[in-house]
Regions:
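Surface-exposed binding/hinge segments that line
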Residues: 82, 116-166
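Sec/Tat signal peptide C-region and signal peptidase I cleavage site
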Residues: 12-17
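A structural "hinge/loop" feature
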Residues: 27-42, 65-67, 143-155, 184, ...
């Protein structure tokens, strides 16, 4: 297994610029905040919508739309969330506990790709405008973690625009929420052309102004799938910031005047999966047998993999050999098993 690094590159001139032209390999699949549980989709959504809880750069929990949260002292199956006062959506509507009740219920519905994260929640109650109780089917210490990508949606906006139900992505449905947005986040949606360009502008009424370094007033997000084209766009000045820099291009980008490469450990582990549970492997040339069911075969394959060579040659140093599927900054990691 390999723990990978997240790699990005930014033009020095963009640090003080009012507009940030940002590119990465893939576009958001939808703007519906509960339709897809997927990386690029969440990355864009986090600019527009907000969850109750976020993580800081070290992976620790940080208050967002909830200022504090804890199990009730009277019942460990009831979590109490106190909400941030004075928060408004981009259209000016107030954020309240009713929006939390609505958003959790919406995210638990059939078409939602987020529902598995909320399986333990059996009831959500608005105690008052700024207090919510979530009732679980048993003690659930990882509930805060499951809520860090669960975005809050304005129930009134959803009702007014016919998007109370989550977009049916698998069925090919297109809804108002798939191409429009009304969140509480730092940036507001200006325009959206899927797979072409998305333009955001800073939310002048954002509650987090002064707490977060909002250094640009406009974001122009352009998906560029081809890696070489993406790097060329950065080198030519067409964009200011790219994610997913190919490891083979890191030195060239880093040695270009005016560009900076940033790397950080990524919450991602690449591993070689083995089908050890099947009686027979369908695509091999041995009928009626599964050699991977034999632990000795699996151990032999484990010893045969040259992790250091993969790290140095394939990943160009942008990875770390791992002994378990959880990276060090994820709860559950232990040095003894890694």
């Amino acid at each position: 297994m390999l723990l990978t690094a997240a790699v990005s590159a930014v033009a020095i001139s963009s640090v003080s610029a009012e507009t940030l032209r940002w590119a990465r390999a893939g576009d958001s699949l939808t703007l519906d905040p509960h339709a897809q549980n997927e990386g690029p989709t969440h990355t864009l959504a986090h600019q527009i919508y907000e969850p109750l809880i976020i993580r800081d750069m070290s992976g620790q929990f940080q208050a967002a739309l909830a200022t504090d949260w804890a199990p009730s002292p009277d019942d460990p199956n009831v979590w109490v969330f106190n909400l941030r006062e004075g928060v408004t959506y981009h259209d000016g509507a107030a954020f309240t506990a009713e929006d939390v009740v609505f958003s959790i219920g919406r995210a638990q519905s059939e078409n939602s790709n987020m529902k598995e994260l909320l399986n333990s929640i059996v009831e959500v109650r608005a105690v008052d405008d700024l207090t919510v109780e979530m009732v679980t089917d048993g003690p659930n210490p990882i509930l805060p973690s499951n809520l860090t990508n669960l975005f809050m949606m304005d129930s009134g906006w959803a009702e007014a625009n016919g998007v109370v139900q989550v977009q049916d992505v698998e069925g090919g449905e297109t809804t108002f929420a798939a191409t429009n947005a009304n969140g509480t986040g730092a940036y507001k949606l200006v325009s959206r052309e899927p797979d072409v360009r998305t333009v955001l502008t800073q939310n002048e009424n954002y509650w987090g102004i002064g707490q977060f370094p909002l250094e640009v007033t406009e974001i122009i997000y352009t998906p560029i799938q081809n890696a070489a084209t993406r790097v060329a766009a950065l080198l030519s000045g067409e964009v200011d910031f790219i994610q997913d820099v190919p490891v083979q291009d890191l030195d060239r980008v880093a040695n270009t005047d005016g560009l900076i490469v940033k790397t950080a450990p990524q919450n991602r582990v690449i591993f070689f999966g083995m089908n050890m549970g099947a009686a027979d492997i369908a695509n091999d040339n041995v009928d009626g047998a599964n050699p991977l069911a034999d632990v000795r075969v699996r151990r032999a394959m484990n010893m045969a993999i040259n992790r250091d060579a993969i790290q140095q040659v394939v990943m160009r140093g942008q990875s770390q050999p791992a002994g378990m599927i959880a990276p060090p900054f994820v709860n559950g990691w232990t040095a003894e098993m890694d």
